[in-house]
Amino acid sequence: AFGFMLPVLAGFIAMAIGDRPALAVGFVGGMIASGGKSGFLGALVAGFAAGYIILGLRKICAKLPQAIEKIAPVLLYPVFGILIMGLLMNFVVEPIMGAINTALNTGLSNMGETSKVLVGLILGGMMAIDMGGPFNKAAYVFGTASIAAGNYDIMAAVMIGGMTPPCAIALATLLFKHKFTKEQREAGPTNFIMGLAFITEGAIPFAASDPLHVLPACIVGSAAAGALSMAFNCTLMAPHGGIFVFPVVGNALLYLVALVAGTVISAVLLGLLKKKVD
């Protein structure tokens, strides 16, 4: 299943740009990236490239006779799209992005303590920026790709960054009840469960109702948790699971400390930033 992550990522990026005909083209590009050296970065490029390849083919096919235009989505788009994608990946994307990806993984393996903490800070914060959106997914896929490269501390920072927002919101609904509506207070405890299970999306309704105050608080707490996870040299070899994979976390006790610290920081900031509900 892990081997399909990059192809699926590339396929759905492509589909978001070029609609359904781009899915197969993006998937093929992601497969080439997954089997080559470009990895996550190559899959990202493949997804965008596939989407725009299909858009280009659509404009070209619009000038063809109507009889040919009707078969374009099922014949011309996939055949020419996959052909172009294969050439692009093998002769352009793989050499360039492969070199960048190799250098990046080497740098991550050899980085000093300060640099590791900074990476954890950034990735943890990204997990809370849009809570399930592009930034969140980019950080998550980078974390899972790092597992394959043997950098298990990165995945630990990513997961803890995603666990923090729901846990923090749940804690804030208990500590600062006057800052939340009755419905939000009732939904608060559920976020504890979702946060511990690494389901960041549980925080979305709270962020959507007050993004200017909720998002900054969650980002700061998640960034702090990610940085602490790196500072404590915590590691994680599983791509998901939340508290259920704590038995395979390296330095699990300190990992829990980092989670509690990030949760408390975000909860306190929520209490300070949010306005009192009438």
Regions found by a protein language model. Give the residues of each.
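Pore-lining transmembrane helices
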Residues: 1-66, 70-277
